[in-house]
Amino acid sequence: MSKLKELPLSALQFYATAPYACSYLDGRMARSQVATPAHLINADVYSRLVRAGFRRSGIFTYRPYCDECHACTPCRVVVDQFVPDRSQRRAWSRHQHLQALVAPLTYVEEHYSLYLLYQSMRHAGGGMDQDSRDQYEQFLLQSRVNSRLVEFREPPGSPEAGRLRMVSMIDVLDDGLSSVYTFYDPLERNASYGTYNILWQIRQTRELGLPHLYLGYWIADSRKMAYKARFRPLQVLTGNHWHAFEDEAGDAASPAPASNRD
């Protein structure tokens, strides 16, 4: 990089939030480190921050900064070495007929309705099922980086042609894709939309000639986050270096069982 291009990153400031209730591990308090100002975090700077363990929520870029707990571990799939297991192959076979449309981040009422339904059935009591349209847009549709929205529908000619099944937000980085958030039809209890979505993103990353799919944070003791260990080979960020997941996780490296959460 030239010095001129490095300026936005060197001009960033980082602050720690006040403690708040952890949304992944009951009874624990969490803190985040937030990068500011947001207008300096362009696609190039954001790619470097993601490699350092940051994520984003809307225009806010953050990473875990807890006082004692270090359960949140950044993880990424090495896509050119990935081989799906049997359950993942079944998920791909079950849903590969879905028609994917990649678009800019755009508000669609049908997407918002599916989001509320998903939150009410998959994360009841978390409060996000009460999100207003403004909250939904701030969370998922505001971005200063290279972001895309992908919707998955039943294809023309099928019994439920055009039915919306899933919506996913992704960021395009200089070394991969970053999976931001996904919500899907929770009424299909035997579906594996979550697994299929990650498989689809792995394939897209590979087709773009990029090496990594960033999946956010792996948390061994959180069922909502431990499933990421099923996508191997996985790398995790510890001590400012990316390592093979198995080398760092020890006994916790045993993949979480598949469930209907996917």
From Swiss-Prot:
It comes from the Bacteria. It is found in: Cytoplasm. Keywords: Acyltransferase, Cytoplasm, Transferase. GO terms for biological process: ubiquitin-dependent protein catabolic process via the N-end rule pathway. Its EC number is 2.3.2.29. Transmembrane segments: none annotated. GO terms for cellular component: cytoplasm. Functions in the N-end rule pathway of protein degradation where it conjugates Leu from its aminoacyl-tRNA to the N-termini of proteins containing an N-terminal aspartate or glutamate. NCBIfam families: PRK01305.1-1, PRK01305.1-3, PRK01305.2-3. Belongs to the R-transferase family. Bpt subfamily. This is Aspartate/glutamate leucyltransferase. The gene is bpt.
